[in-house]
Amino acid sequence: MKMRAVAVFTGMLTGVLSVTGLLSAGAYAAGGEGNMSASATETNARVFSLHLGATRVVYNPASSGETLTVINDQDYPMLVQSEVLSEDQKSPAPFWWTPPLFRRDGQQSSRRRSVSTGGEFPSDRESRQWICVKGIPPKEDDRWAEGKDGEKKADKVSLNVQLSVSSCIKLFVRPPAVKGRPDDVAGKVEWQRAGNRLKGVNPTPFYINLSTLTVGGKEVKEREYIAPFSSREYPLPAGHRVRFSGR
């Protein structure tokens, strides 16, 4: 018996954020650690984050690489640190992001390329990796923070609290044998009840992402992707009677 569920599919992922606070020496300018000056406490924190020009990148192993636009929306320069990680978001993936470290001026953008350095991926389905970029704030003595006129831009952005933000998007390795798009086959996912959980079976070679999933008008939370040729279980809404429709 198969379950009637309503699912809205999307191939996009919002950025995964990791925030780290960096306390500058300016916060302790007057009176030491326990006696911060009024001017120091009035300084606002700034976030060093970057805007990516896409929510995902599809990589064809037969291509020469894929590009992604990196945008600095801030009014000050920052270093951009980039890397490609495996599905666990911990170990390095066999990709080279060129260049892995570069400066981006305020209100400026540039296109960067990811290139495969080898590795073995299945030929009959998508594989998922992660592209991560991190904005690094300048310090007062960083020469790269100088403007074109030689002015120290770092002095203007030296804050008592600086937030360095890392944003990650999906990199799908899609082999030539996998034709079509995920949107074209998303309706093929089969939904079943497994105890007090909802089971989605993905018979396609694509990663299927769910933006919304409802059962009987109630939203199913903790939505996650369903990997190719696999299944995933989701908690059913509490107190809801599940009705089946057989096919």
Swiss-Prot record:
N-terminal signal peptide: 1-29
Keyword Metal-binding in record: no
Predominant location category: periplasm
Domain of life: Bacteria
Cellular component annotations (GO), alphabetically ordered: outer membrane-bounded periplasmic space
Assigned keywords, A-Z: Chaperone, Immunoglobulin domain, Periplasm, Signal
GO biological process: cell wall organization; chaperone-mediated protein folding
Sections of the chain in a coiled coil: none
Record's subcellular location: Periplasm
Sequence segments annotated as region (Disordered): 106-125
SUPFAM superfamilies per record: PapD-like, Periplasmic chaperone C-domain
Database matches in Pfam families: PapD_C, PapD_N
The family this protein is said to belong to: Belongs to the periplasmic pilus chaperone family.
Function of the molecule: Involved in the biogenesis of the NFA-I adhesin.
Family matches, as PANTHER family: CHAPERONE PROTEIN CAF1M, PILUS ASSEMBLY CHAPERONE
Protein name as catalogued: Chaperone protein NfaE
Source species of the chain: Escherichia coli
Encoding gene per record: nfaE
